[in-house]
UniProtKB/Swiss-Prot annotation:
Stored SUPFAM superfamilies: FKBP-like, Triger factor/SurA peptide-binding domain-like
Domain PpiC: 173-274, 286-385
Reaction(s) catalysed by this chain's protein: [protein]-peptidylproline (omega=180) = [protein]-peptidylproline (omega=0)
Domain of life: Bacteria
Disulphide linkage map: none
Residue spans crossing the bilayer: none
Pfam families referenced in this protein's UniProt entry, alphabetically: Rotamase, Rotamase_3, SurA_N
This protein's name: Chaperone SurA
Primary role: Chaperone involved in the correct folding and assembly of outer membrane proteins. Recognizes specific patterns of aromatic residues and the orientation of their side chains, which are found more frequently in integral outer membrane proteins. May act in both early periplasmic and late outer membrane-associated steps of protein maturation.
Broad class of the protein's primary localization: periplasm
GO CC annotation: outer membrane-bounded periplasmic space
Source organism (scientific name): Chromohalobacter salexigens (strain ATCC BAA-138 / DSM 3043 / CIP 106854 / NCIMB 13768 / 1H11)
């Protein structure tokens, strides 16, 4: 059974995959292929990653470059990953088992499986549950670093949202399938470095004009985050285009590659793979539920059976007339609502985990649920009120806010990766053949 893609993972997942199986053949003496500040990256790790990336590329029908180019690209991603893991260590960031368990359980639920079924499916895909857990832990840690260092720098104001809402035009109703090549320049580059990058991007552009395969060239030569996916950026609505490309992409024909585009991070080539029309915004009316809950989770002193038993006891006490709010303040493990007596306010579809939402849908106003199991623990839920609400304008604003936020994060991410790379000691022995 093949698992659905773990879409929540960040861009480093492709090269963060653990090897699926250890070779039974005798291994040659391991060597250092790169030193990143105080840490070494060994050749065995690099070869494991290269093997995994080749499998990933084959499954996505992305043409693989030659071995040397692929190893160089994978090592470059491993170096960037190592810098971020070192930043996490210095900042004392960590992922505890409770967070990890909830995330892994959520992945299983998103694939419609129990944990036992999920473990079996992983085995069929050649990966143990233990190795998958460590992969997810590492990726969550990288996301923490990126969140603290990049997303925290980005802010979208209400004025920006309203201005965009007033100004968005026809491009918002068109979706574009894009691919991208980046030829980067260092932070504060010299004129010679800029000239070298410009010469390289011009050469790549000429090759593409002469019929070179964009995906293969991106995999071999791009410094962009999606290089190992053939530079594929996927489908983007017009209002989701990176600000750098927003004026260029609508002028391209399907299959056309833009001329080099200059940015502080380097030179970009963008290919428009395909275009499709989008339906206009439809009126959106949803059912909102005002709910409160008490969450009983597991911890080192309370196993799953004990958590369920406590939740049932609390539910019975409420049914017997005790105060829901008082019991929530005393027992609930949801720090965000416990002090408010478990109040979650008005909730809309998609805001809660599926098990919680399904339970709420089945309740009548004023009714108390039986304990409901989710990835977070056991919930005792009371439906306080229900209403129909037109959220069209709110949905538009939130969509635009997320679009502008992701656009800013994308722009900031390129600058940040250059910044952390420039600030690190990197001895890449693969580049000069010393490995």
């Amino acid at each position: 059974m093949r698992l659905r893609s773990f879409a929540f993972l960040g861009f480093m997942l492709l090269v963060a995959m653990a090897p699926s199986m250890a070779s039974a053949q005798p291994q040659p003496l391991d060597r250092i292929v790169a030193v990143v500040n105080k840490d070494a990256i060994m050749q065995s790790r690099l070869e494991d990653r290269v093997t995994q990336v080749r499998r990933q590329m084959a499954s996505r029908n992305v043409p693989a470059p030659n071995e040397a180019d692929l190893r160089r690209q994978v090592l470059d991603r491993m170096i960037l990953e190592q810098i971020q893991l070192q930043m996490a260590e210095r900042a004392n960031l960590s992922i505890d088992d409770t967070q990890l368990n909830a995330t892994v359980r959520g992945i299983a639920e998103d694939n419609g499986m129990s944990m036992d079924e999920f473990a079996d499916a992983l085995e069929e895909d050649g990966m143990s549950l233990a190795s998958m857990r460590e992969q997810v832990r590492r990726e969550m840690l990288l996301r923490q670093v990126q969140q603290s260092q990049v997303a925290s720098r980005v802010n979208v104001t209400d004025r920006e949202v309203e201005r965009y809402l007033d100004q968005q035009g026809e491009t918002a109703d068109t979706a574009y399938h894009l691919a991208h090549i980046l030829v980067s320049v260092p932070e504060s580059p010299t004129p010679e470095q800029v000239e070298q990058a410009q010469a390289k991007v011009r050469d790549l552009y000429r090759q593409l004009q002469n019929g070179a395969n964009f995906a293969q060239l991106a995999t071999a030569e791009s410094d962009g985050q999606q290089a190992l996916s053939g530079g594929d950026l996927g489908w983007r609505r017009g209002d989701q285009l990176p600000s750098l490309f927003a004026d260029v992409v609508p002028t391209l024909s399907n299959g056309e590659v833009s001329e080099p585009i200059r940015s502080p991070s380097g030179f970009h080539l963008v290919k428009l793979i395909d275009t499709r029309g989008q339906q206009g915004e439809q009126k959106r009316v949803v059912t909102e539920n005002r709910v409160r809950h008490i969450l009983i989770g597991t911890n080192p002193n309370r196993n799953d059976q004990q958590a369920e038993a406590l939740a049932r006891d609390i539910r019975q006490r409420i049914a017997n007339g005790e105060s829901f709010a008082a019991l929530a303040q005393e027992y609930s493990d949801d720090d965000g609502s416990a002090l408010d007596g478990g109040e979650l306010g008005w909730t809309r579809p998609g805001q809660m985990v599926p098990a919680f939402e399904d339970a709420v849908k089945a309740l009548d106003v004023g009714e108390l649920s039986q304990p409901v199991r989710s990835r977070f623990g056991y919930h005792v839920i009371e439906l306080e009120d229900r209403r129909r609400q037109d959220v069209t304008r709110d949905a538009q604003r939130e969509q635009i806010r997320q679009t502008l936020f992701q656009r800013k994060v994308s722009d900031e991410m390129e600058a940040w990766t250059q910044e952390i790379r420039s600030g690190a000691y990197i001895d890449n022995r693969l580049e000069d053949g010393r490995q």
